[in-house]
């Protein structure tokens, strides 16, 4: 009796899945008239027009300014007085340095 019940359940599941798949397939007959009246070039122009219209609506809240121009950008670092390789600029005198000019710069001095 349980084997017959399992077969009926399997048949019912198979029937439901089959009906679902058949029902889910699209019927392209509905799109036949719409596709015939426009060429691919016209479809591309229509898509481009819709994208421009959407872009205009997206920027309307900011007075037409694109969002990338409204982003806050980090300011650049202030100019440093140190030159490369740990040397100072010409305005610093040799007497102001804490060590002799010929001394080798340490690891921390090269940052």
Swiss-Prot record:
Subcellular localization: Secreted
Keyword Signal on entry: yes
Signal peptide range in chain numbering: 1-24
Primary location class: secreted
A GO cellular component entry from the record: extracellular region
Any GO BP annotation: neuropeptide signaling pathway
Prosequence residues removed at maturation: 25-76, 88-111
Domain of life: Eukaryota
Keywords, in A-Z order: Amidation, Neuropeptide, Secreted, Signal
Positions of modified residues (Phenylalanine amide): 85
Tissue distribution: Expressed throughout the central nervous system (at protein level).
Function in brief: Plays a role in controlling food intake and regulating body size.
Family of the protein in this entry: Belongs to the NPY family.
The name this protein goes by in its record: Short neuropeptide F
Species: Camponotus floridanus (Florida carpenter ant)
């Amino acid at each position: 009796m349980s084997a017959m019940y399992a077969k009926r359940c399997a048949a019912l599941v198979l029937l439901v899945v089959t009906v679902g798949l058949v029902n889910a397939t699209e019927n392209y007959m509905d799109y036949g008239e719409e596709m015939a009246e426009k060429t691919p070039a016209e479809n591309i122009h229509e898509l481009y027009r819709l994208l421009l219209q959407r872009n205009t609506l997206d920027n309307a809240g900011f007075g037409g300014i694109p969002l990338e121009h409204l982003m806050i950008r980090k300011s650049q670092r202030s100019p440093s007085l140190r030159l490369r390789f740990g040397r100072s600029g010409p305005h610093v005198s040799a007497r102001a340095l804490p060590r002799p000019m010929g001394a080798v710069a340490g690891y921390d001095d090269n940052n």
